[in-house]
Curated annotation (Swiss-Prot):
GO MF, one annotated term: NADP binding
Source species of the chain: Chromohalobacter salexigens (strain ATCC BAA-138 / DSM 3043 / CIP 106854 / NCIMB 13768 / 1H11)
Official protein name in the record: Shikimate dehydrogenase (NADP(+))
Annotated active site: 67 (proton acceptor)
Lineage, broadest ranks: Bacteria, Pseudomonadati, Pseudomonadota, Gammaproteobacteria, Oceanospirillales
Binding site for NADP(+): 128-132, 152-157, 215, 238
Function: Involved in the biosynthesis of the chorismate, which leads to the biosynthesis of aromatic amino acids. Catalyzes the reversible NADPH linked reduction of 3-dehydroshikimate (DHSA) to yield shikimate (SA).
Domain of life: Bacteria
Record gene name: aroE
Length: 271
């Protein structure tokens, strides 16, 4: 009997660490499965998914630029996927339908909590208003922060996303120039760190003992985490978020929850 097949779809995707992560999960949990990276054509994600399923594929992760394509493709959406407007996990159901979920927000919250960060009652700031931010708002709100503010270069995008995420006003939005006050947790949901760029942030942004979290990660601290260290903050990069969201996807497919700590240590050594 052949192993169950899983994959990650992206374009480009050769750099993805997901195959390594899921190989470690499978070994740890004794699961007979394979996991590969597939570069889908930008104009035909649906075709790539259906071909994978026809060849025996059981499920997939989805990364840029296909998260919205996967959302539209799905037959059944989880509530959190419907709220996020994008998905990163697909499951081929026994009934032949495609089930979809998003695990990014859960991954972020679990990684923050694994680092001892208290979200309840915290003042949280998120930088950016793209898909990466949209997908994490609900899980953060579920932790009952005292405030959740979105800041973006284009202020109107932040305001619109805040209104969509919380019509009752629990989330606020605005531009970088309007930032005022100190925050307990500042999350960089932009890809600026990949280009070595830093959003225009005031020096007083981080509260005493504040935490700066970058969704990006690298072998060395990103420019955002360097900024945090220079302003007395504790920096955490996004490697743990990647591993925690992968663990949630793994659970959706296999109904087994892996221990993420040893995988995080292994991946950190391999950076």
């Amino acid at each position: 009997m052949s192993d169950d097949r899983y994959c990650v779809f992206g374009n480009p995707v050769a750099h993805s660490r997901s195959p390594r992560i899921h190989a470690l999960f499978a070994e740890q949990c004794g699961q007979a499965m394979t996991y590969e990276a597939i570069e889908a054509p930008r104009e035909d994600f649906a075709g790539a998914w259906h071909a994978f399923v026809a060849a025996g594929g059981c499920g997939a992760n989805v990364t840029v630029p296909f998260k919205e394509d996967a959302f539209r493709l799905a037959d059944v959406l989880s509530q959190r996927a419907r709220r996020a407007g994008a998905v990163n996990t697909l499951v081929r159901g026994r009934d032949g339908r495609t089930y979809a979920d998003t695990t990014d927000g859960v991954g972020l919250v679990r990684d923050l909590e694994a680092h001892g960060v208290t979200l309840e009652g915290a003042r949280i700031l998120i930088l950016g208003a793209g898909g990466a931010v949209r997908g994490v708002l609900d899980p953060l709100l579920a932790k009952a922060p005292s405030c959740l503010h979105i800041a973006n270069r284009t202020a109107s995008k932040a305001v619109r996303l805040a209104e969509e995420a919380s019509p009752e006003g629990r989330v606020t939005g605005g531009g970088y120039s309007e930032l005022d006050g100190a925050f307990d947790v500042v999350i960089n949901g932009t890809s600026a760190s990949l280009g070595g760029e830093l959003p225009p942030l005031p020096d007083t942004l981080l509260a005493a003992d504040g935490v700066a979290y970058d969704m990006m990660y690298a072998a060395e601290p990103t420019v955002f985490l360097q900024w945090a260290a220079a302003h007395g903050g504790r920096g955490i990069d996004g490697l743990g978020m990647l591993i925690e969201q992968a663990a949630e996807s793994f659970f959706l497919w296999r109904q087994v929850r892996p221990d993420t700590a040893p995988v995080r240590e292994t991946l950190r050594r391999e950076l």
